[in-house]
Amino acid sequence: MIKKNRDAEVYALGQHICMSAHKARRVIDQIRGRSYEEALMILELMPYRACYPIFKLVYSAAANASHNMGFNEADSVISKAEVNDGTSVKKLKPRARGRSYLIKRPTCHITIVLKDIYLDEKYIIWLRKYGWIYRNKYTDMTCRDMYGSGGVWDKK
């Protein structure tokens, strides 16, 4: 049995969100397994109403990760994203001749779990296997601040 590092995971939970679970699942399936920054970019550009509450949850999970655990947001990956059915909000709509029709508004519960990939043991083993880590020193190939250093376009 593989032990999971529980210290490497942070979650955000949104309950009783007024939308169909089926419609929310369509959006959640697009971001599951992606990095935090890539998921935010996808959610900003998708034209669905379900994107905004999910965007807020992903952002909240990253804020929890950086504040509570001290994770770097750029190193976070959405390891688990699930949508469950919630209760139906029932309303009565008045109709002619004193009748009323029942309106059911579906709700859902959304859970987003972020994982820091640098605290995951399998990822560290994979990095060692392909030569990215030498003697417990990590070789970083990413450019963190691409546009902040000035560059050619800032000069007159």
UniProtKB/Swiss-Prot annotation:
Family matches, as NCBIfam families: rplV_bact
Classification via Gene3D superfamilies: Ribosomal protein L22/L17 (3.90.470.10)
Localization (cell): Plastid, Chloroplast
Full protein name: Large ribosomal subunit protein uL22c
Lipid metabolism is among the record's keywords: no
Disulphide-bonded residues: none
CC annotations in GO: chloroplast; large ribosomal subunit
Keywords for this protein: Chloroplast, Plastid, Ribonucleoprotein, Ribosomal protein, RNA-binding, rRNA-binding
Subunit structure: Part of the 50S ribosomal subunit.
Gene giving rise to this polypeptide: rpl22
KW Mitochondrion (keyword) present: no
Cross-referenced InterPro entries: Ribosomal_uL22, Ribosomal_uL22_bac/chlpt-type, Ribosomal_uL22_bac/org-type, Ribosomal_uL22_CS, Ribosomal_uL22_sf
Function description: This protein binds specifically to 23S rRNA. The globular domain of the protein is located near the polypeptide exit tunnel on the outside of the subunit, while an extended beta-hairpin is found that lines the wall of the exit tunnel in the center of the 70S ribosome.
Family: Belongs to the universal ribosomal protein uL22 family.
PANTHER family reported in the protein's UniProt record: CHLOROPLAST 50S RIBOSOMAL PROTEIN L22-RELATED, LARGE RIBOSOMAL SUBUNIT PROTEIN UL22M
GO biological process: translation
